Amino acid sequence: MTIKYAAKEDISAIAAVEAECFPPAEAAIEAEFVERVKYYGNHFWLLYNADKLIAFVDGFVTDELDLTDEMYENAAMHNENGAWQMIFGVNTLPDYRKHGYAGELISRAIADAKQQGRKGLVLTCKERLIPYYAKFGFKDEGVSDKSTHGNVAWHQMRLSF
């Protein structure tokens, strides 16, 4: 298993994993990943098993305190010197779930954010996933009023350093 950052040649695989992990209303499409990788490929954590992408975590950096729907749509909002590492997606192919791979990538994103001097990380998740992210130190801030992505109630969670 190898963890790496995203480059142009990873985009098709990233989009395929995303499509398998999220319903269409929530999944980013390949064109969105082209923009995301262009602006913040170094904030994608990709886990490869040989030459197969099996899991990834991604999100950009900003000074904004809260994750908003606009962030998903506008990769140019990325600010490499921002205070907060946002997490937009945590994806693992179904056949590879329950092996700790997503946790390994989340831990790597946390370590990188600390090393880069960020204030912490912010993500949104469905209610059933709150206990999962709490294991990494994220605190539930309640249902977000700034994200209704895919017409879902998202809980904002924050890990502050």
Positions of predicted regions on the chain:
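Active-site rim helix/loop that mediates acceptor-substrate recognition in acyltransferases
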Residues: 24-50, 56-77
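Hydrophobic adenine-recognition pocket in adenosine-nucleotide-binding enzymes
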Residues: 6, 90-92
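C-terminal "cap" of GNAT-fold acetyltransferases
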Residues: 126-127, 146-161
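Short hydrophobic/aromatic beta-strand element in the GNAT-like acyltransferase core
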Residues: 42-46, 56, 89, 122, ...
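Conserved GNAT acetyl-CoA-binding A-motif
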Residues: 106, 112-125
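Conserved acetyl-CoA-binding loop of GNAT-fold acetyltransferases
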Residues: 23, 134-143
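A short beta-loop-alpha structural element at the N-terminal edge
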Residues: 2-14
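Conserved acyl-donor/pantetheine-binding loop and adjacent beta-alpha core of acyl/acetyltransferases
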Residues: 55-90, 97, 107, 147-154
